[in-house]
Amino acid sequence: MVTGRLTTTISQKTKVAQNNHLHIEFKKMSIQLNLDGLSFCIFNPGLSCIESIYHLSLPASMPPILVEQEVQKYLNEERALCQDFDTIKVLHNNEQFAFVPEKLFATEHLFEYLKFNVAEYRNQIISHDTLSGEKMINVYIPNAAINRVLRETYGIFEYEHFTTTLLGVLLMHNPQKKDAIYTHFD
């Protein structure tokens, strides 16, 4: 199955508190999927602060069905993760990606772009992000099982590959495109 970047805007949540005062929540959550687990960051833009950070460690050798169960269990147990969020962004941080020049990109060739970087890519969902200012496409394999658990829990959300976000931030700090070297340690 092939998909492009999935985007969702979850509408602002308005609730009536117990004392009948109108309460508006403006909270954002980002979730980073790494090879060793998931990290959750809840940000309150109204207060301009990070409210909480959580991490769920998962062994790389754990079977996918058990990973799904552990993630679902964790999401149900952590109260702060059980609330409504205005936006949710998921970053897939894995080595299963390839950058492709925009001029050479065609959705019917997604498998071809990954065949040199990814050992096992058949029967996988392949997605892609666009770095329009750089005229590049990042083709990658998201973790479909965890995306499914997150979709069942939160509804629709936006996801992209970690390197798309990282490259976007780095390039934002170098608008004149001067020679620069960046390193990232994971």
Question: In which residue ranges do the predicted regions lie?
Answer:
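Small-residue (GG/TT-enriched) beta-loop-alpha framework at ligand/catalytic clefts
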Residues: 2, 37-38, 49, 127-186
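Gly/Thr-rich phosphate-binding beta-strand-loop-beta motif of the actin/hexokinase/Hsp70
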Residues: 2-47, 173-186
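A broad structural signal for short, well-ordered beta-strand segments within beta-sheet-rich domains
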Residues: 26, 47-53, 67, 85
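Hydrophobic beta-strand segments of well-ordered beta-sheets in folded domains
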Residues: 29, 83-90, 186
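Short beta-strand segments
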Residues: 32, 90-93, 140, 183-184
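Short acidic, S/G/P-rich loop/turn micro-motifs used as interaction or catalytic elements
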Residues: 37-38, 57-62, 96-99
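Extended intrinsically disordered, low-complexity coil regions enriched in Ser, Thr, Gly, Ala
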Residues: 42-63, 107-110
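Internal amphipathic helical hairpin motif
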Residues: 65-80, 88, 92-135
